[in-house]
Amino acid sequence: MTVDTDKQTLGFQTEVKQLLQLMIHSLYSNKEIFLRELVSNAADAADKLRFEALVKPELLEGSGELRIRVDFDKEARTVTIDDNGIGMSREDAVSHLGTIAKSGTADFLKHLSGDQKKDANLIGQFGVGFYSAFIVADQVDVYSRRAGLPASDGVHWSSRGEGEFEVASVDKPERGTRIVLHLKDGEDSFADGWTLRNILKKYSDHIGLPIEMRKEHYGEDADKPAEPEWEVVNRASALWTRPKSEIKDEEYQEFYKHVAHDAGNPLAWSHNKVEGKLDYTSLLFVPGRAPFDLYHRDSAKGLKLYVQRVFIMDQAEQFLPLYLRFIKGVVDSADLSLNVSREILQSGPVVDSMKSALTKRALDMLEKLAKDKPDDYATFWRNFGQALKEGPAEDYANREKVAGLLRFSSTHDTTGAQSVALADYVGRMTEGQDKLYYLTGESYAQIKDSPHLEVFRKKGIEVLLLTDRIDEWLMSYLTEFDSKSFVDVARGDLDLGKLDSEEDKKAQEEVAKSKEGLASRIKAALGDDVAEVRVSHRLTDSPAILAIGQGDLGLQMRQLLEASGQAVPETKPVFEFNPAHPLIEKLDAEQDMDRFGDLSRVLFDQAALAAGDSLKDPAGYVRRLNKLLLELSA
């Protein structure tokens, strides 16, 4: 390699200096992750070369034996990671090593918590793994040449991690990238063969590429041979190609960390080989925590796709539906072409068949997790439950299966935890109950004592309490479970079916008929603010309630539309009153039309507040309430 030419000094992307300092100081107890990250990057570089060489075999430059080499020099106090993968051009080095992938600097800084374990988990997720080199090194030199470029187009990138980096042109006969870490004072322990081998065994044994280290000689053989001898220190076989019986849990966990760029362990995994009409192997993982961008439209999602063990692409979204975008893993197919493109993957019988099978496999994995490890499933639900709730709308074929995985709060559990499965609810249904009842609202605290629940509590009927913003939208697609219909207890004219006796129904009709005059008076007082006024069959303790019209949008859907800037259709609630309540009896007896109007309006506003809605005229409500209080105290 010749001396540097055409040298430039450039500044890091804004905030990278701060980022480096934060990483160095917040991750000092997890120093060994630098090797995991750099080896993982080297493996990715080999995958990219394999893929590009499918179309341009000349990129292999006569050498298709890909490998990673890790070396050290005790005297020089250096550690070197060398690969013969795709390599970088000068422009690549400036853009890839001078800025942060995904423009993620600000997000990374925002998510650093001071908890070293959590912060270590963020490194790969934000595409900043290269910078972990500065945890142990006070200077990093990178020598690289992109495959296909002449030897004279090599690049030397160098930085001390202090806000600037130098880049220069060098001759580099071999393609690929060599990273030389100049260890800080006190980090000499990493310039040791035994230490490096242990770290590689711990973090990188699953890498499907040979990782080589120089063979060390001791005793009588201590004289080094003229040419270094290299030995493979990892298994160097793709984990998913090995029999399941030979793979330890720890190996699956380390492979997950590599493929998902996550330092935490997965909650579950499913490893399957399919043979028959289609031949493919899949290894799917359920992460232990949600990525920061799970609900971002352009977030990374999809499986790593291999064809006959040749890497094709990251983030192949075509093999799982969007609601399962949190699933990580690999799929290795023998039925797809090596030159498959994202466009080709958009449709076709092979892809469609694989997607259907992989979706079922992922849902089966979640069912098993829920059955065998309910505490882990509760963790999964906290992280990914809202994504899974998109399933009934997106995946009609698996709607019932997805519904069985959903969890809700209910009146059965006073903790408010989303722990009730629909199958559990069905198992607790009372005699004569043929419907599944639910109520939506902004929070458990807001709806747990809702007047809409009064008649259900009286009859001992469980009601699901749906408090996620997505829930009302979900229920517009999830209309039944186990052949039983869902009923919103706040919507329409409540009909409890067999839960009300014929005598009850007849009595309700008689009361409604006897109070038609009162209903007309209240409707006149409330005017166009209500669609209808009627006697309520929902109430036992409260004086009044607002019901949603059968075809109208509820509060959650209105808020969703408003938040997205869409027009919200005007709707009017139905005012229902409890004829047995003392306030309604007093209202019925009131002859003063002004007082009747004020009391009707106060009851209407209170019902709106109980439903979680805001008042159109809060000052008017306070004025009327104060007036009535003064009259009562006179």
Swiss-Prot record:
Keywords tagged on the record: ATP-binding, Chaperone, Cytoplasm, Nucleotide-binding, Stress response
Gene source species: Xanthomonas campestris pv. campestris (strain ATCC 33913 / DSM 3586 / NCPPB 528 / LMG 568 / P 25)
Homology family: Belongs to the heat shock protein 90 family.
Region (B) residue spans: 343-559
Primary localization class, coarse: cytoplasm
GO CC terms in record: cytosol
Region listing for C, in residue ranges: 560-634
GO biological process, one term: response to heat
Disulfide partners: none
Quaternary structure (record): Homodimer.
Keyword Chaperone in record: yes
A Pfam family assignment: HSP90
Stored HAMAP family: HSP90
A: annotated segments: 1-342
Lineage: Bacteria, Pseudomonadati, Pseudomonadota, Gammaproteobacteria, Lysobacterales
SMART domains: HATPase_c
InterPro entries: HATPase_C_sf, Heat_shock_protein_90_CS, HSP90_C, Hsp90_fam, Hsp90_N, Ribosomal_Su5_D2-typ_SF
Name of the protein this chain belongs to: Chaperone protein HtpG
Its job: Molecular chaperone. Has ATPase activity.
Localization terms from the record: Cytoplasm
GO molecular function: ATP binding; ATP hydrolysis activity; ATP-dependent protein folding chaperone; unfolded protein binding
